[in-house]
């Protein structure tokens, strides 16, 4: 007997492929075309409940509901739109948790910044998400839903997805890879338009390369490493978890990843005014990047209430970038979006949780 497709831990159909849903229908005693109908209604029509899929026999729909099967869509709690049209969504899960995602539009693209966990265990000093610790990892349906929800809310097809929201993607590696497969196969976002970010977890980059090759056939998404400092002492100050992963070991593992995948690595560097944005830091960073198949993304810090870090001036950002460019480093500056609506990672969710506690 063919094995029944594996549902997520919350018995959701969202995240399953057309082939999986066809097999699911057959195992349920229905014709395989019923699975294709479910696929169309979930991924193209945005069905949020089984009862809304009117083409399915009501008797079967009722049976699935009794078994606890669900589509697995999240419930919108709040939405905020910034002056630059950046969208921030807060969505509720089946167990009462809050997921945060961001839609970032430009003229030619719509990037969705998705979360991979509820909270985060890494404790990066500049990040609002890490202040509350980790609650749990997200299931595939909860990751994919973020992209669908932004598509529906903005009435526009997402072109890019970045795993740069709440959580450490490599601590939820299987669900992240499964959701990438769903995003490419079922929603139509090419792997090259997807970025997976990590602060660096020891002994995971080679595993990521091998697992991704097994799951996706070929690694085409971009790996973005959150570096944020050019030396170990400063990195541990900004990212406490870095104490267990020396920067030289991290870079060595990045080179192995490049060898295994043939893909360059992107390094994220958040500029904290007066702390890691001096000329000497740019020079140290340029030395680290020497001989690397890489790209550096500079990000000016978005302040959060709990920390006293400062946002650098635009002139300091420009000087830092120019110093890297003059030393042959491929570098760009990421534009800050949604600053008037607390669009830094985790801010809106944390404020919402605080309000709930107060009330």
Curated annotation (Swiss-Prot):
Record GO terms (molecular function): 4 iron, 4 sulfur cluster binding; metal ion binding; rRNA (adenine(2503)-C2-)-methyltransferase activity; rRNA binding; tRNA (adenine(37)-C2)-methyltransferase activity; tRNA binding
Binding site for S-adenosyl-L-methionine: 167-168, 197, 226-228, 302
Class of enzymatic activity (EC top level): transferase
A Pfam family per the record: Radical_SAM
Cysteines paired by S-S bonds: 113-345
UniProt key word Cytoplasm: yes
Reaction(s) catalysed (UniProt annotation): adenosine(2503) in 23S rRNA + 2 reduced [2Fe-2S]-[ferredoxin] + 2 S-adenosyl-L-methionine = 2-methyladenosine(2503) in 23S rRNA + 5'-deoxyadenosine + L-methionine + 2 oxidized [2Fe-2S]-[ferredoxin] + S-adenosyl-L-homocysteine; adenosine(37) in tRNA + 2 reduced [2Fe-2S]-[ferredoxin] + 2 S-adenosyl-L-methionine = 2-methyladenosine(37) in tRNA + 5'-deoxyadenosine + L-methionine + 2 oxidized [2Fe-2S]-[ferredoxin] + S-adenosyl-L-homocysteine
Keywords of this entry: 4Fe-4S, Cytoplasm, Disulfide bond, Iron, Iron-sulfur, Metal-binding, Methyltransferase, rRNA processing, S-adenosyl-L-methionine, Transferase, tRNA processing
Keyword check for Membrane: no
Residues making up the signal peptide according to the UniProt record: none
Record EC number: 2.1.1.192
Protein residues bound to [4Fe-4S] cluster: 120, 124, 127
Subcellular location: Cytoplasm
Biological process according to GO: rRNA base methylation; tRNA methylation
Active-site feature positions: 100 (proton acceptor), 345 (s-methylcysteine intermediate)
Further facts: Reaction proceeds by a ping-pong mechanism involving intermediate methylation of a conserved cysteine residue.
Protein function: Specifically methylates position 2 of adenine 2503 in 23S rRNA and position 2 of adenine 37 in tRNAs.
Identification of the protein by name: Probable dual-specificity RNA methyltransferase RlmN
Organism: Prochlorococcus marinus (strain NATL1A)
Organism ancestry: Bacteria, Bacillati, Cyanobacteriota, Cyanophyceae, Synechococcales
GN (gene name): rlmN
